[in-house]
Amino acid sequence: MEMGLSKKLVLVTGSTKGIGKAIAKEFAREGADVVINGRKAEDVAKVVSALKEEFPQTNPQAAPFDITDETARNQLLEQFPEVDVLVNNMGIFQPMEVEAITDAVWNRFFQTNVLSGNALAKHYLPKMLEKDFGRIIFIASEEAIMPSGEMPQYSMTKTMNLSLAKSLSKLTKATHVTVNTIMPGSTLTEGVEAMLEEMYTQSDLPKEEWEADFMKNHRPLSQIQRLIRPEEVGRFVTFVASPYASSFSGEALRIDGGLVPTIF
């Protein structure tokens, strides 16, 4: 289905790998001009080059800036003062026991997972309202509504994403601008692949059975009993950004394979 995103300028933060990269690719597939963001210029350049080769009708652009740094973030905003779609995907996670989480760790997660995206939203939202079109999408996690206890500092920031997006959506009343949050469940990113490698390399279990074993023993509530693929998240994000999802406003949308057992 044609999503109506051709030639839209889309900024996806943290888009050199994982879910962010998959989101960027799906936007490019829809004909959007995607701004690729990451801290390492060489990683950004590789993704931009790959998108240009696969989708020559589009104009992917590079934004090699660490958006947790105010100076670098301002450079990004100067280079791209307006966008049609902002996907706040960039974030960090790390399993930690609560006793080990220092104030410095709490602050780092807050700065990275909340304040950086908030700063971009504060810049772009007024411009979207002026032209009466725009989409801001925060990528959270099922941890936002069902904390596992494995990484409280991460779960807290993802819950804050939900509240922030809902608050920002209140500013878009009677416009064609929307602000929403998407909560993916466990997804087969490079980071998760590395985690499985670490968990199972020393075991006798064949590699092709790692995923099923992980889901059975570590994500037993999942109804699909497999890891979500990044491109599945990417396709959902492009739909939420499209004109077809214009009635979605202030929503917390789940794509978790049934992992969260509650209705709401």
Where are these regions (language model features)?
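Residue(s) in the substrate-gating loop at a strand-loop-helix junction
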Residues: S141
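Substrate-binding pocket helix/loop in short-chain dehydrogenase/reductase
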Residues: R73, E97-V98, V105-F110, H218
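Short, small/polar-rich loop/turn modules that mediate ligand/substrate recognition or access, typified
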Residues: K173, T178, F248-G250
